[in-house]
Amino acid sequence: MVVGPISNLRDDALKDDTLNHIRKEYLESKKQISNLLSQETNTNEFSRKPYPNSSPIRKFDHFANERPTTIDAKLREQLRTGASDVAIEQSLRTNSDESRNQMIYDDMKVMKRIIDGQQESIRELRRALEQERYMNSELQRKYNEMERRFDRLEWFINSHDKFQAYQDIRSNTTKKDFSDPIFNNGLKRRWDEYPIRSFEPDTNINRNNRIFSNYDDSTTRLMQITDPHYRSVG
């Protein structure tokens, strides 16, 4: 609820309406009482009879001034002149101030309820924000863990591929070196450039037959036994 110039205007309008309504009722009541009093006065004047045996009122009798007739006259005078308007307006003003204070108090209670509701909404939003931050941190942690696992898997795959390629190269090299008699497009291997004595006779190579007379050992005997040429020479 807005408390400001608009609320003040509304309060002033309500105050004026209340005062006018009460003043109107007061004037109507005053008019009715005046009519009744005037009628009563006229009736008393026509019906009043003198009392010849009545004693005159003494001047020192203080209670005589406060007789009911005098009090009624004072009341009639006050009603005729409106001497009590100030007191009535003060009473009305007091009632208006009380009603205005009550309205302000009600507005303050409404504003307090609104503020309490907004504070509760802020607390709910804060709790939701904290929960969202926790969920985001958990997702970030899981993402980092998954990224580390992918890195390890990629490293393992690359290492396995390199190891497999190395194994393939090694197997191919071993197969060519030890299984194939011909290497490098039909050319002889470097370590086969020179003829090596074998157990089979080689007719393509003319060798000088040498006799190791000084080393007549078992190896020479074995060579002589296995080689027919050495056997004929011996």
UniProtKB/Swiss-Prot annotation:
Its main location: nucleus. Keywords: Cytoplasm, Cytoskeleton, Nucleus. One of its GO terms (molecular function) is structural constituent of cytoskeleton. InterPro entries: Spc29 (IPR031392). GO terms for biological process: spindle pole body duplication. Coiled coil: none annotated. Residues 38-57 are annotated as: Disordered. The keyword Cytoplasm applies. It is found in: Nucleus; Cytoplasm, Cytoskeleton, Microtubule organizing center, Spindle pole body. The keyword Transmembrane helix does not apply. Component of the spindle pole body (SPB) required for the proper execution of spindle pole body (SPB) duplication. Links the central plaque component SPC42 to the inner plaque component SPC110. This is Spindle pole component 29. It comes from Candida glabrata (strain ATCC 2001 / BCRC 20586 / JCM 3761 / NBRC 0622 / NRRL Y-65 / CBS 138) (Yeast). The lineage of its organism: Eukaryota, Fungi, Dikarya, Ascomycota, Saccharomycotina.
